[in-house]
Structure formats: structure tokens, C-alpha cells
Amino acid sequence: MKKYLSILSAVAVAAAMVACEKDGNDDANKVDVNDPSTVQTEHLVAYFPLESEAKAVELGKDITFSKKGGSAAFVEGVRGKAYANSAADCKVFSYLDFKLGANNPFKTMSSFTMSAWVKSPVPNDGSPAMLSINAGDGGMGSLLVMYEGWGCNTDSLYVKSYLFNTRTEWKGQDLGLSNVAFTTDKWFHLVYSYNEATSMMTLYSNGQFVAESGRWAGPEVNGKQEGLGKLILDPAMSNLYIGAWWNNLDGTHADAWRSSYPGSVDEIRFWDIALTPEEIEDLYTKEVTKADKL
């Protein structure tokens, strides 16, 4: 009987140990509900934490960090480190270069959302590019987020978003404006989206809607005008740059007004869908929760 009880006790102890170990693993594997990457995770296709050269990109099929150029540096950001033009000068070359392979996710995005923390002074020269993807239009590229230097004010930046749809007659599309929601010298969370179902380009700041514009595939024909619809970016794309115009770096359109981004960028994410206003607000809440410094 004692032997039988001893066996039962040993079994009970072993079971308890397994249960504890399992509980511990469950805790370790629990999803952090406050992580911004939990917003539409299945559609999150690229994530650039911009912590260092080794951890500039964390998620993104066929996206690899290539090099840091000019006055590019990794400095204190909203969450950990961030990319910055250490000279804070549009006239000083500064960029990060990422190579885009044949299977990169930007080639197949028919809709998209891009989010990033940005902080910049008023541009002191030209119109700087915060993010650019090459190919597409020879001047503007496939996808672009820039500031129009002439449209910025002391308290607000002129943010301009651009895309190039290869499948439509009217290919180059943009949405840009100056707004106090795009603050100077202060971090704000910028979201740029395109929705193929509505043909709308939209800009948000700190989780709130700022502006939108319906885009068209071509001119009106017989009283009807087709929306831009499904997006197909140029499959010839090969590079994504943070902080500089792609054509300044490859020399194809090295115009003087295409200046370097003078500020900082952190936590860039791309989804292959247009997030809803509610999801964008939720994303901002999670971003703030995870922020080290704002």
C-alpha cells in the first residue's frame, strides 16, 4: 500500500511540474495585446524598427538592409532607436538603403497602409523625401512620402504622399497638404493609406483623420469616370530608401530641389490593406503605450 501511495505521489508531483512548465511556456508565448504589430497581423507585410544596421528591418519578405549613407545615424527614438539625419540639414546627404528582391511585398499590394513616427524641423532647402521606392515614374518613383518645402510653416509641415499605378491611364497620384496636425520639431504618428475599394488616398496624424482624396484611373468617358481601383506598383522596383530621393542616389534625376530628409523616423510599418479609421486609432494607442519617449 505504501509503495502504491508513493507511486501516486510521484505521478502527482510529475503532473504538477508539467503543468507548471506548461503554464510558464504559455506565459512566454502570450501575445502582447499592446504591441502595434497585433493590428491586422495577418496583413502586416513589413516592419522597420530602425534600431541599428543589424536591426533596421525585422519583417518583410525579400527586404534586406544594404547600407547607411552620409550623415545617417541611429539615435534615441520613440521606441528604442530611430533613424536620423544627424546634421538636421536638407543639404547634407543622409539615407538608409534597403534592397527589394523579386518577391518583396510592395509588388503585390493592391491596397496598403504605411505608418511611421516622424519628427522634423521645417526643411531648410528644397523638398525632402522621408521614404521613397524606385522605378515607376522617372521623377517620383513607385511610392513616396515627402515634404514640400515651399508649403511648410513654422508650426506645420506640408506632407505629400505619392503612388504610381502601372495599370491605369493616369498613373501618378498624390495627396498633400500643410496642416497643424503635422507638427514641426515634435514626434507625430503619420499614417498614409490607399483603399482600392474606394479609390481613396488618406492621411492621418496621431490616430486622427486629416485628409483624403478620391483618385481616378483616367478621364471621364461618356459621363462616367472610373476610380483608380486596384493598385499595381512597378515590378521593376529594387530599392527602398529612408531619408532620400531614390533618383538622387542612382543619378537619374539628381535635381537640386530633391533634398535630404532633415529629421528622424521610427517604427515604420506596412500593411497590404487599407486599415479602417478604428484600426488606425487603435494602432496609435498601442504605439503610444509602447513608446519610450514622446
Which residues fall in each region the model found?
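Short surface loop/edge beta-strand patches of beta-sandwich-type extracellular domains
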Residues: 29-39, 89-112, 174-180
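Flexible glycan-contacting loops in extracellular carbohydrate-active proteins
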Residues: 214-263
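Extracellular, beta-strand-rich glycan-interacting domains
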Residues: 46-53, 113-122, 237, 256-287
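Extracytoplasmic low-complexity segments
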Residues: 4-6, 17-91, 236, 281-294
